[in-house]
From Swiss-Prot:
Residues 1-14 form the signal peptide. The lineage of its organism: Eukaryota, Metazoa, Ecdysozoa, Arthropoda, Chelicerata. Binds 1 Mg(2+) ion per subunit. It is an enzyme of class 4 (lyase). It catalyses: an N-(acyl)-sphingosylphosphocholine = an N-(acyl)-sphingosyl-1,3-cyclic phosphate + choline; an N-(acyl)-sphingosylphosphoethanolamine = an N-(acyl)-sphingosyl-1,3-cyclic phosphate + ethanolamine; a 1-acyl-sn-glycero-3-phosphocholine = a 1-acyl-sn-glycero-2,3-cyclic phosphate + choline; a 1-acyl-sn-glycero-3-phosphoethanolamine = a 1-acyl-sn-glycero-2,3-cyclic phosphate + ethanolamine. Expressed by the venom gland. Disulfide bonds join 74-80, 76-219. GO terms for molecular function: lyase activity; metal ion binding; phosphoric diester hydrolase activity; toxin activity. This is Dermonecrotic toxin LiSicTox-alphaIA1bii.
Length: 302
Protein backbone atom coordinates (compact mmCIF):
# COMPACT_ATOMS: atom_id res chain seq x y z
CA UNK A 1 0.00 0.00 0.00
CA UNK A 2 2.86 2.32 0.86
CA UNK A 3 4.35 1.86 -2.61
CA UNK A 4 1.00 2.72 -4.19
CA UNK A 5 0.63 5.80 -1.96
CA UNK A 6 4.21 6.81 -2.76
CA UNK A 7 3.47 6.66 -6.47
CA UNK A 8 0.22 8.55 -5.92
CA UNK A 9 1.97 11.36 -4.10
CA UNK A 10 4.59 11.67 -6.86
CA UNK A 11 1.79 11.70 -9.44
CA UNK A 12 -0.19 14.37 -7.61
CA UNK A 13 2.92 16.50 -7.22
CA UNK A 14 3.55 16.17 -10.94
CA UNK A 15 -0.07 17.07 -11.66
CA UNK A 16 0.21 20.09 -9.37
CA UNK A 17 3.36 21.25 -11.17
CA UNK A 18 1.55 20.82 -14.49
CA UNK A 19 -1.34 22.93 -13.21
CA UNK A 20 1.03 25.66 -12.04
CA UNK A 21 2.77 25.65 -15.40
CA UNK A 22 -0.59 25.75 -17.14
CA UNK A 23 -1.63 28.94 -15.37
CA UNK A 24 -0.10 30.75 -12.42
CA UNK A 25 3.60 30.59 -13.11
CA UNK A 26 3.44 31.26 -16.83
CA UNK A 27 3.47 34.82 -18.10
CA UNK A 28 0.33 35.58 -20.14
CA UNK A 29 1.25 36.93 -23.57
CA UNK A 30 -0.77 39.17 -25.85
CA UNK A 31 -0.09 38.39 -29.54
CA UNK A 32 -0.99 41.70 -31.14
CA UNK A 33 -1.99 41.66 -34.80
CA UNK A 34 -0.45 44.76 -36.37
CA UNK A 35 -2.32 47.27 -38.56
CA UNK A 36 -5.73 45.57 -38.57
CA UNK A 37 -7.64 48.34 -40.35
CA UNK A 38 -10.30 46.51 -42.40
CA UNK A 39 -13.13 44.56 -40.77
CA UNK A 40 -12.21 41.44 -42.76
CA UNK A 41 -8.72 41.49 -41.24
CA UNK A 42 -10.09 40.94 -37.72
CA UNK A 43 -10.94 37.29 -38.46
CA UNK A 44 -7.81 36.89 -40.58
CA UNK A 45 -5.46 37.87 -37.73
CA UNK A 46 -7.36 36.11 -34.93
CA UNK A 47 -7.48 32.91 -36.97
CA UNK A 48 -3.68 33.10 -37.29
CA UNK A 49 -3.36 33.22 -33.49
CA UNK A 50 -3.76 36.88 -32.45
CA UNK A 51 -5.63 37.46 -29.18
CA UNK A 52 -5.21 41.21 -29.62
CA UNK A 53 -5.21 43.64 -32.53
CA UNK A 54 -3.79 47.09 -33.22
CA UNK A 55 -5.87 49.47 -35.31
CA UNK A 56 -4.84 52.88 -36.67
CA UNK A 57 -7.18 55.83 -36.14
CA UNK A 58 -6.86 58.96 -38.29
CA UNK A 59 -8.60 62.24 -37.41
CA UNK A 60 -10.18 64.99 -39.50
CA UNK A 61 -9.38 68.70 -39.05
CA UNK A 62 -12.01 69.02 -36.31
CA UNK A 63 -10.44 66.20 -34.23
CA UNK A 64 -13.16 63.69 -35.13
CA UNK A 65 -11.91 60.11 -35.50
CA UNK A 66 -12.44 59.50 -39.21
CA UNK A 67 -10.85 56.34 -40.64
CA UNK A 68 -9.00 53.24 -39.50
CA UNK A 69 -6.17 54.15 -41.82
CA UNK A 70 -2.37 54.02 -41.73
CA UNK A 71 -1.26 55.18 -45.17
CA UNK A 72 2.16 55.18 -46.84
CA UNK A 73 4.80 54.37 -45.69
CA UNK A 74 4.01 51.37 -43.51
CA UNK A 75 5.60 48.03 -42.65
CA UNK A 76 7.48 46.18 -45.40
CA UNK A 77 5.33 43.54 -47.07
CA UNK A 78 2.00 45.10 -46.03
CA UNK A 79 -0.76 46.95 -47.90
CA UNK A 80 -0.74 50.39 -46.23
CA UNK A 81 -4.04 51.55 -47.69
CA UNK A 82 -6.76 49.31 -46.23
CA UNK A 83 -9.31 51.24 -44.20
CA UNK A 84 -12.89 51.60 -42.95
CA UNK A 85 -14.88 54.53 -41.66
CA UNK A 86 -14.02 54.53 -37.95
CA UNK A 87 -17.57 53.95 -36.74
CA UNK A 88 -18.12 51.10 -39.21
CA UNK A 89 -14.97 49.44 -37.92
CA UNK A 90 -16.21 49.85 -34.34
CA UNK A 91 -19.45 48.07 -35.23
CA UNK A 92 -17.52 45.21 -36.84
CA UNK A 93 -15.24 45.04 -33.82
CA UNK A 94 -18.25 44.99 -31.51
CA UNK A 95 -19.66 41.97 -33.38
CA UNK A 96 -16.31 40.18 -33.04
CA UNK A 97 -16.13 40.80 -29.27
CA UNK A 98 -19.75 40.33 -28.16
CA UNK A 99 -20.56 36.82 -26.83
CA UNK A 100 -23.54 35.34 -28.66
CA UNK A 101 -22.91 37.30 -31.86
CA UNK A 102 -22.50 35.10 -34.95
CA UNK A 103 -19.17 36.85 -35.66
CA UNK A 104 -17.90 36.43 -32.06
CA UNK A 105 -14.20 35.61 -31.64
CA UNK A 106 -13.68 34.46 -28.05
CA UNK A 107 -9.90 34.76 -28.27
CA UNK A 108 -9.90 38.48 -29.15
CA UNK A 109 -9.56 40.20 -25.78
CA UNK A 110 -7.55 43.42 -26.29
CA UNK A 111 -7.57 46.20 -28.89
CA UNK A 112 -4.90 48.89 -29.20
CA UNK A 113 -6.06 52.03 -30.97
CA UNK A 114 -2.97 53.66 -32.49
CA UNK A 115 -4.21 57.25 -32.43
CA UNK A 116 -2.67 59.22 -35.30
CA UNK A 117 -2.86 62.56 -33.48
CA UNK A 118 0.14 63.97 -35.37
CA UNK A 119 -2.31 65.69 -37.73
CA UNK A 120 -3.83 67.67 -34.82
CA UNK A 121 -2.75 70.80 -32.98
CA UNK A 122 -1.78 70.19 -29.35
CA UNK A 123 -4.82 72.18 -28.19
CA UNK A 124 -7.14 69.73 -29.99
CA UNK A 125 -6.05 66.70 -27.96
CA UNK A 126 -8.73 67.06 -25.27
CA UNK A 127 -11.40 67.43 -27.94
CA UNK A 128 -10.10 64.37 -29.80
CA UNK A 129 -10.43 62.37 -26.56
CA UNK A 130 -14.04 63.49 -26.08
CA UNK A 131 -15.02 62.66 -29.64
CA UNK A 132 -13.25 59.30 -29.48
CA UNK A 133 -15.15 58.44 -26.28
CA UNK A 134 -18.50 59.40 -27.84
CA UNK A 135 -17.87 57.16 -30.85
CA UNK A 136 -16.71 54.21 -28.75
CA UNK A 137 -19.62 54.57 -26.34
CA UNK A 138 -22.19 54.55 -29.12
CA UNK A 139 -20.74 52.15 -31.67
CA UNK A 140 -18.53 49.81 -29.62
CA UNK A 141 -19.96 49.76 -26.11
CA UNK A 142 -23.53 50.09 -27.44
CA UNK A 143 -24.23 52.83 -24.86
CA UNK A 144 -23.33 50.43 -22.07
CA UNK A 145 -25.88 47.82 -23.13
CA UNK A 146 -24.11 44.50 -23.86
CA UNK A 147 -21.51 46.07 -26.14
CA UNK A 148 -18.08 44.68 -27.05
CA UNK A 149 -16.13 43.18 -24.16
CA UNK A 150 -12.51 43.67 -25.27
CA UNK A 151 -10.12 45.75 -23.21
CA UNK A 152 -9.06 48.93 -25.03
CA UNK A 153 -5.63 50.64 -25.02
CA UNK A 154 -5.50 54.25 -26.18
CA UNK A 155 -2.04 54.61 -27.70
CA UNK A 156 -0.87 58.21 -28.11
CA UNK A 157 2.28 59.06 -30.13
CA UNK A 158 3.00 62.46 -28.58
CA UNK A 159 3.52 63.13 -24.84
CA UNK A 160 2.10 66.64 -25.35
CA UNK A 161 -1.24 65.08 -26.27
CA UNK A 162 -1.83 63.70 -22.75
CA UNK A 163 -5.03 65.88 -22.41
CA UNK A 164 -6.68 63.37 -24.78
CA UNK A 165 -6.94 60.99 -21.81
CA UNK A 166 -8.81 63.51 -19.65
CA UNK A 167 -11.13 64.42 -22.52
CA UNK A 168 -11.95 60.75 -23.03
CA UNK A 169 -12.60 60.13 -19.33
CA UNK A 170 -14.64 63.33 -18.87
CA UNK A 171 -16.88 62.45 -21.82
CA UNK A 172 -17.63 58.94 -20.53
CA UNK A 173 -18.45 60.41 -17.10
CA UNK A 174 -20.67 63.10 -18.64
CA UNK A 175 -22.51 60.44 -20.65
CA UNK A 176 -23.13 58.38 -17.51
CA UNK A 177 -20.64 55.55 -18.05
CA UNK A 178 -17.51 56.24 -15.96
CA UNK A 179 -17.35 52.48 -15.20
CA UNK A 180 -16.22 51.84 -18.78
CA UNK A 181 -12.83 53.35 -17.85
CA UNK A 182 -12.24 49.99 -16.12
CA UNK A 183 -11.87 48.60 -19.65
CA UNK A 184 -9.48 51.35 -20.84
CA UNK A 185 -5.68 51.47 -20.64
CA UNK A 186 -2.96 53.80 -21.86
CA UNK A 187 0.23 53.85 -23.89
CA UNK A 188 2.59 56.53 -25.18
CA UNK A 189 4.10 55.12 -28.36
CA UNK A 190 6.78 57.69 -29.26
CA UNK A 191 9.77 55.78 -27.81
CA UNK A 192 10.36 58.68 -25.41
CA UNK A 193 12.60 58.47 -22.37
CA UNK A 194 10.78 56.36 -19.75
CA UNK A 195 11.17 59.15 -17.17
CA UNK A 196 9.47 61.64 -19.52
CA UNK A 197 6.62 59.18 -20.09
CA UNK A 198 6.16 58.97 -16.31
CA UNK A 199 5.94 62.77 -16.11
CA UNK A 200 3.25 62.86 -18.81
CA UNK A 201 1.12 60.38 -16.83
CA UNK A 202 1.58 62.54 -13.71
CA UNK A 203 0.27 65.56 -15.63
CA UNK A 204 -2.63 63.46 -16.91
CA UNK A 205 -3.38 62.24 -13.37
CA UNK A 206 -3.09 58.61 -14.46
CA UNK A 207 -1.92 55.73 -12.32
CA UNK A 208 -2.47 52.14 -13.40
CA UNK A 209 -3.73 50.56 -16.64
CA UNK A 210 -0.39 51.48 -18.25
CA UNK A 211 1.11 49.61 -21.19
CA UNK A 212 4.50 50.73 -22.48
CA UNK A 213 5.36 50.15 -26.11
CA UNK A 214 8.76 50.10 -27.68
CA UNK A 215 9.62 49.45 -31.28
CA UNK A 216 10.15 50.34 -34.88
CA UNK A 217 8.87 49.34 -38.31
CA UNK A 218 9.77 45.79 -39.40
CA UNK A 219 11.88 47.35 -42.20
CA UNK A 220 14.53 48.37 -39.65
CA UNK A 221 16.37 46.57 -36.84
CA UNK A 222 16.12 47.83 -33.25
CA UNK A 223 17.86 46.71 -30.08
CA UNK A 224 16.17 45.86 -26.80
CA UNK A 225 17.81 48.45 -24.53
CA UNK A 226 14.64 50.54 -24.09
CA UNK A 227 12.52 47.39 -23.69
CA UNK A 228 14.89 46.37 -20.90
CA UNK A 229 14.44 49.79 -19.27
CA UNK A 230 10.63 49.49 -19.51
CA UNK A 231 10.69 45.95 -18.06
CA UNK A 232 12.94 47.15 -15.22
CA UNK A 233 10.43 49.92 -14.44
CA UNK A 234 7.54 47.44 -14.54
CA UNK A 235 9.29 45.05 -12.18
CA UNK A 236 10.52 47.67 -9.70
CA UNK A 237 8.64 48.47 -6.49
CA UNK A 238 7.99 52.07 -7.53
CA UNK A 239 7.54 51.64 -11.30
CA UNK A 240 4.47 53.02 -13.09
CA UNK A 241 4.33 50.51 -15.99
CA UNK A 242 2.04 47.44 -15.82
CA UNK A 243 2.77 45.80 -19.18
CA UNK A 244 5.43 46.11 -21.88
CA UNK A 245 4.99 45.32 -25.57
CA UNK A 246 7.44 45.30 -28.47
CA UNK A 247 6.71 46.01 -32.15
CA UNK A 248 6.87 45.00 -35.01
CA UNK A 249 8.21 41.47 -34.64
CA UNK A 250 8.02 39.13 -37.63
CA UNK A 251 10.93 36.72 -37.03
CA UNK A 252 11.24 33.75 -34.70
CA UNK A 253 14.66 34.90 -33.47
CA UNK A 254 13.37 38.37 -32.53
CA UNK A 255 10.32 36.79 -30.87
CA UNK A 256 12.60 34.67 -28.67
CA UNK A 257 14.73 37.71 -27.80
CA UNK A 258 11.61 39.70 -26.82
CA UNK A 259 10.23 36.86 -24.69
CA UNK A 260 13.63 36.39 -23.04
CA UNK A 261 13.59 40.12 -22.21
CA UNK A 262 10.30 39.60 -20.36
CA UNK A 263 7.75 41.44 -22.53
CA UNK A 264 4.00 40.92 -22.05
CA UNK A 265 2.97 41.64 -25.63
CA UNK A 266 4.44 41.22 -29.09
CA UNK A 267 3.01 43.13 -32.03
CA UNK A 268 3.39 41.30 -35.31
CA UNK A 269 2.33 41.02 -38.95
CA UNK A 270 2.50 37.22 -38.56
CA UNK A 271 0.68 35.99 -35.42
CA UNK A 272 1.38 32.38 -36.45
CA UNK A 273 5.14 33.00 -36.07
CA UNK A 274 4.67 34.14 -32.45
CA UNK A 275 2.32 31.20 -31.80
CA UNK A 276 4.93 28.77 -33.14
CA UNK A 277 7.62 30.13 -30.80
CA UNK A 278 5.25 30.03 -27.81
CA UNK A 279 4.71 26.35 -28.59
CA UNK A 280 8.43 25.56 -28.47
CA UNK A 281 9.31 23.45 -25.42
CA UNK A 282 11.51 26.13 -23.81
CA UNK A 283 8.79 28.78 -24.05
CA UNK A 284 5.73 26.62 -23.38
CA UNK A 285 6.90 26.20 -19.78
CA UNK A 286 7.19 29.93 -19.12
CA UNK A 287 4.52 31.58 -21.29
CA UNK A 288 0.92 31.11 -22.41
CA UNK A 289 -1.48 33.02 -24.63
CA UNK A 290 -3.54 35.46 -22.54
CA UNK A 291 -7.30 34.91 -22.27
CA UNK A 292 -10.17 37.17 -21.21
CA UNK A 293 -9.57 36.08 -17.61
CA UNK A 294 -6.14 37.72 -17.65
CA UNK A 295 -6.55 41.32 -16.54
CA UNK A 296 -4.29 43.36 -18.85
CA UNK A 297 -3.88 46.09 -16.21
CA UNK A 298 -2.35 43.78 -13.59
CA UNK A 299 1.43 43.47 -13.47
CA UNK A 300 2.48 39.83 -13.73
CA UNK A 301 4.68 38.86 -10.80
CA UNK A 302 7.12 36.08 -11.52
Amino acid sequence: ARVVLGCWSVLSQAAQTDDEERAGNRRPIWIMGHMVNAIGQIDEFVNLGANSIETDVSFDDNANPEYTYHGIPCDCGRNCKKYENFNDFLKGLRSATTPGNSKYQEKLVLVVFDLKTGSLYDNQANDAGKKLAKNLLQHYWNNGNNGGRAYIVLSIPDLNHYPLIKGFKDQLTKDGHPELMDKVGHDFSGNDDIGDVGKAYKKAGITGHIWQSDGITNCLPRGLSRVNAAVANRDSANGFINKVYYWTVDKRSTTRDALDAGVDGIMTNYPDVITDVLNEAAYKKKFRVATYDDNPWVTFKK
